[in-house]
């Protein structure tokens, strides 16, 4: 049995220039995940369920657990001194870590502390998403938004933690995707899936079909394609949608499938955040042999203009994403007007 800590150190030894800072940073995320795991499991017994009564910069109600997870992860990252600052879905602006080693720290972290938190009240899987970049600004100076507004191709590492029937941490540093399952009796994450790859073909599609009337024509056509009978392509595909990006992505990664959150009439730019959700998941998907686009463009190539920028998102088994892109190209939005 190999633990997450042992695995990370082992991989670090493969690079003679490695300084151990990224290892320490990932260890901080691991600690934050353990704390969130512990408190999610007793969420119904203490007063951390439901809405907090405040809204984020996007005008969305923040759940108590959103804020709790944000504070715990922020504290864990700040304590290690390997991070110059963070950007979070739950923060209006970047958070600069002052003092200690922070000003000379090499990395910045972007995160969605608790994805799918609206599901927690009914005991449905939720998750944490993180993305790590090297800072652009000079060491010894305060970081700026410039350090965070980098395309996804610049990511050093990315991953997520899914809190479900078991808690699992999945990450990549650009050398494959690896998954670790938490053993609460030992307090450690143990390697359970090494070099995870998407199956060559998929048979699941994940999309909120309740918004069908608002979808672009190409997406509507693709959904109908998924539902049609065709033995050669093993259709109809199975529809599976949890409403938690981490949970839907994780299932499709292991089983084969596509996750879609397109632009809609009410959210023409898409709803998912490019920096906190799309980029890290796209990095993981590509490292696992999958594909991630906004329906036309590769997600990782998009140069962000603002912290809370949104994007349409198509991610999963490569052939399924390419099929969806084909329908979008064949039936452009103009035909739906």
Swiss-Prot record:
Write down how the cofactor binds this protein.
Binds 2 magnesium ions per subunit.
This chain's protein is named: Fructose-1,6-bisphosphatase class 1
Q: Where does Mg(2+) 2 bind?
A: 112, 115, 277
**Enzyme class, broadest EC rank:** hydrolase
Q: What is its EC number?
A: 3.1.3.11
User: InterPro entries given for it?
Assistant: FBPase_C_dom, FBPase_class-1, FBPase_N, FBPtase, Fructose_bisphosphatase_AS
Q: Where in the cell is it found?
A: Cytoplasm
| MF-aspect GO terms | fructose 1,6-bisphosphate 1-phosphatase activity; magnesium ion binding
The UniProt keyword set, sorted, is: Carbohydrate metabolism, Cytoplasm, Hydrolase, Magnesium, Metal-binding
Instruction: Show the NCBIfam families listed in the entry.
Output: PRK09293.1-1
The pathway is:
Carbohydrate biosynthesis; gluconeogenesis
Record-linked PANTHER family:
FRUCTOSE-1,6-BISPHOSPHATASE-RELATED, SEDOHEPTULOSE-1,7-BISPHOSPHATASE, CHLOROPLASTIC
Its subunit composition reads: Homotetramer.
Major site of localization recorded for this protein: cytoplasm
Q: Which family does it belong to?
A: Belongs to the FBPase class 1 family.
Catalysed reactions listed for this entry: beta-D-fructose 1,6-bisphosphate + H2O = beta-D-fructose 6-phosphate + phosphate
Annotated coiled-coil positions are none
Q: Where does this protein hold substrate?
A: 115-118, 208, 241, 271
Q: Which gene encodes it?
A: fbp
Q: Which domain of life is it from?
A: Bacteria
Cofactors named for this entry: Mg(2+)
Extract one GO cellular component term from the record.
Answer: cytosol
CDD domains reported for this sequence: FBPase
